[in-house]
Swiss-Prot record:
Protein name: Interleukin-2
MF terms in GO: cytokine activity; growth factor activity; interleukin-2 receptor binding
Naturally occurring in which organism (per UniProt): Oryctolagus cuniculus (Rabbit)
Any one annotated GO CC term: extracellular space
Origin superkingdom: Eukaryota
Length: 153
């Protein structure tokens, strides 16, 4: 009787292990998602840097929360939490006369990609400091680059 339960337990454990084990295709998919996230962050940074001095100086007055450490995909939760304020600042800078389509599209892409990359795990961000929009985007770009280079080596 115990033998059947033990075998069932072993079979269930093996099934769980094989279904959660990373595969080369999931690694490739993660790599592609990180590349997309990096590209979208760079597009936003380029847009910020293209603003005229008066708009840029106004944008630099807004501060964004940056976590103490950003080393794992779960830390993308912290980026996700700052996406709405980021979008609002970018929309303010664009003004009422221009279309915020590119900004909205980039933010939406970032949100979708972050949700895929971080998974369903909920993570409590420990914020360390506030930074300008340029520093914020640069740090997240650096994070993506470090994860990409670590996974490709």
């Amino acid at each position: 009787m115990y033998k059947v339960q033990l075998l069932s337990c072993i079979a269930l454990t093996l099934a769980l292990l094989t279904s959660s084990a990373p595969t080369s295709s999931s690694t490739k998919e993660t790599q592609e998602q990180l590349d997309q996230l990096l590209l979208d962050l760079q597009v936003l940074l380029k847009g910020v840097n293209d603003y005229k001095n008066s708009k840029l100086s106004r944008m630099l007055t807004f501060k964004f929360y940056m976590p103490k450490k950003v080393t794992e995909l779960k830390h993308l939760q912290c980026l996700e939490e700052e996406l709405k304020p980021l979008e609002e600042v970018l929309n303010l800078a664009q003004g009422k006369n221009s279309h915020g389509g590119n900004t909205r599209e980039s933010i939406s892409n970032i949100n979708v990609t972050v949700l895929k990359l971080k998974g369903s795990e909920t993570f409590m961000c420990e914020y360390d400091e506030t930074v300008t929009i340029v520093e914020f985007l640069n740090r997240w770009i650096t994070f993506c680059q470090s994860i990409i280079s670590a996974s490709s080596s």
